[in-house]
């Protein structure tokens, strides 16, 4: 079986959502899991799992003892929120908010001296975008230099299985709810590293 964690799938800013692997699974070999912690509030702690029919009986017989830690009230409230269409409207509002944040942050990067040696890729991003910096530094050196300045940086090569050199110098910038003050610190640290 394949376990598909479709975390953050709701926040695609451009075009239709990318279909889940589970939605294309003709052999019923994908277990689909997701959570409402990013779309609602982390303290809600409600997740869900879609099992292939073949696994349902086995799941029920082995997990029957499990006592759910989420209150029934929260579960019923979430179910009503979904059934009455409020969740979809909530997601649309979040997407508009995140789109505004992304545009503001990209504007700040474009006004920075860093823009002379970098390019932003944001077409299909959710709550992140890619910043490709033309540099001779390795991704390990970039991460180390950023950490020395109190910044945690993810590089695209960390998410790749092979040919990581092809993705050298591409930073994954996560931006949800990032204050301007924090962003200025991040941009300043990146300018120190690359300029």
Segments (PLM) and residue ranges:
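Active-site C-terminal subdomain of aminotransferase-like
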Residues: 54-74
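Catalytic PLP-binding core of fold-type I/II PLP enzymes
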Residues: 1-15
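Conserved glycine-rich beta-strand-loop-beta hairpin in the small C-terminal domain of fold type I
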Residues: 79, 95-106, 118-132, 142-144
């Amino acid at each position: 079986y394949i376990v598909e964690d479709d975390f953050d799938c709701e926040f695609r800013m451009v075009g239709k959502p990318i279909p889940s692997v589970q939605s294309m699974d003709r052999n019923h070999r994908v277990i689909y899991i997701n959570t409402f912690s990013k779309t609602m509030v982390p303290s809600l702690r409600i997740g869900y799992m879609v099992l292939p029919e073949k696994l349902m009986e086995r799941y029920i017989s082995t997990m029957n003892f499990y006592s759910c830690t989420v209150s029934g009230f929260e579960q019923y409230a979430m179910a009503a929120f979904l059934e009455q269409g409020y969740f979809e409207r909530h997601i649309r509002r979040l997407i508009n908010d995140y789109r505004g944040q992304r545009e503001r942050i990209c504007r700040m990067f474009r006004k920075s001296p860093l823009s002379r040696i970098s390019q932003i890729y944001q077409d299909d991003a959710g709550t992140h975008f890619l910043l490709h910096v033309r540099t001779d530094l390795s991704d390990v050196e970039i991460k180390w230099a950023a950490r020395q300045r109190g910044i945690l940086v993810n590089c695209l090569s960390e998410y790749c299985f092979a040919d990581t050199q092809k993705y050298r110098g591409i930073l994954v910038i996560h931006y949800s709810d990032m204050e301007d003050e924090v962003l200025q610190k991040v941009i300043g640290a990146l300018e120190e590293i690359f300029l």
